[in-house]
UniProtKB/Swiss-Prot annotation:
PROSITE patterns reported in the protein's UniProt record: MPN, UPF0758
Originating organism: Bacillus pumilus (strain SAFR-032)
Similarity-based family: Belongs to the UPF0758 family.
UniProt binding sites for Zn(2+): H173, H175, D186
Secretion signal, residue range per the UniProt entry: none
Lineage of origin: Bacteria, Bacillati, Bacillota, Bacilli, Bacillales
CDD domains: MPN_DUF2466
Name this protein carries in UniProt: UPF0758 protein BPUM_2444
């Protein structure tokens, strides 16, 4: 059956959008990369036949453009697109956690963000999400503007932490004045997030206030 005859909700792209990539089979993901079928075969049929011919994704990854182009309905352009996607997956796999930045001290955290944040003209509130080895998994800008406890919603911060499977996190924000002395709001936000982290089990390790080539650690100041 041609893809246009499939119910809308059963088409790979629509299922990808609705349920996410993990809900699709290998041949459905390959079909998305191949994009189109022929007059006689749907792209899903071509995808399934391609995987069957080579015996699975691993063998497809090792195939040449010429070998893949021999599959009816594929051609060089589709072969290149598929091999490029598989190569990206291979490269991502080889990027081990050993290459991630490690934060062991407040200085490590400040060095990670200083050059990006010291000259910002507005306050940026950023979270650094870490794994169990204190390696940075993700840097996320929570909001831009004056820091206020009513604006910083723990829900948004911990939602991102769960998404990244973080074990802990560090909050960072800048003072455009260049003076990193923490304000009352800075301290209140820090203590609120620290208490939430204790309940949820994702620890706030520190809150760094960035100035011009200097910073303050609220942990070192005794607020955590």
């Amino acid at each position: 059956m041609l893809l246009k005859h499939f119910p809308h909700d059963e088409k790979p792209r629509e299922r990808f959008i609705k349920y996410g990539p993990s809900s699709l089979s290998n041949h459905e993901l390959v079909a998305i990369l191949l994009r189109t079928g022929t007059k006689k075969e749907s792209v899903l049929q071509i995808s399934a036949r391609l995987l069957q011919t080579f015996g699975g994704l691993r063998s497809v990854r090792e195939a040449t453009i010429e070998e893949m182009s021999k599959i009816r309905g594929v051609g060089k352009a589709k072969a290149i697109s598929l091999l490029a996607a598989l190569e990206l997956g291979t490269r991502l796999h080889h990027q081990t956690t050993d290459n991630r930045y490690v934060i062991r001290t407040p200085e490590d955290g400040a060095n990670f963000v200083m050059e990006d944040m010291r000259f910002l003209t507005q306050e940026n509130f950023v979270c650094l999400y870490l794994n169990t080895k204190n390696q940075v998994l993700h840097k996320h800008t929570v909001f831009i503007g004056s820091l206020n406890s009513s604006i910083v919603h723990p829900r948004e911060i911990f939602k991102e932490a769960f998404k990244r499977s973080a074990a802990s996190f560090i909050c960072v924000h800048n003072h455009p004045s260049g003076d990193p002395t923490p304000s009352r709001e800075d301290i209140e936000v820090t203590q609120r997030l620290f208490e939430c982290g204790k309940l949820i089990g994702i620890q706030l390790l520190d809150h760094l206030v960035i100035g011009d080539q200097k910073f303050v650690s609220l942990k070192e100041k005794g607020y955590l």
